[in-house]
Amino acid sequence: MVMGLGLFLLVFMLGLGLTPPTLAQDNPRYRDFLAKHYDATPQGRNDRYCESTMRRRHLTSPCKDINTFVHGNRHHITAICGDENGSPYGGNLRISTSPFQVTTCKLRGGSPRPPCQYRATRGSRNIVVGCENGLPVHLDESIFRP
């Protein structure tokens, strides 16, 4: 009886531990947010970084006018949607309580057609996100422009 209860508790606790990542993987808006805005360990953070990363992530057809990549720990970004690293910022937005390293890629020239050329701006700042079910799904780039 004790062994059966112990096994049940073990399976239950493992199930709890696996639930959040599974839910995150099942949220297409969260996956899209990560694809567009998350880069844990960037190489370079210069104009060439912007051009290659934007192209690799399919953000250049047509050329996207501006895009910001957030660097660092994914958990800290997700925590903005809760009280651990975020606070309300009007409407459904939340602002981080700690700054993040970011690279903002801004389109040079006026043509929305490839080849896209970008200018990189590196910085550290608090970021504003829109959240859905406790996960970031939108980076509000209108709040902070380079």
UniProtKB/Swiss-Prot annotation:
Keywords: Angiogenesis, Cytoplasm, Developmental protein, Differentiation, Disulfide bond, DNA-binding, Endonuclease, Hydrolase, Nuclease, Nucleus, Protein synthesis inhibitor, Pyrrolidone carboxylic acid, Secreted, Signal, Stress response. The keyword Disulfide bond applies. A motif (Nucleolar localization signal) lies at residues 55-59. The active site is at H37, H138. Disulfide bonds join C50-C105, C63-C116, C81-C131. CDD domains: RNase_A_canonical. GO terms for cellular component: angiogenin-PRI complex; basement membrane; cytoplasm; cytoplasmic stress granule; endocytic vesicle; extracellular space; nucleolus; nucleus. The keyword Hydrolase applies. It is found in: Secreted; Nucleus; Nucleus, Nucleolus; Cytoplasm, Stress granule. The modification Pyrrolidone carboxylic acid is found at Q25. This is Angiogenin. It comes from Macaca mulatta (Rhesus macaque).
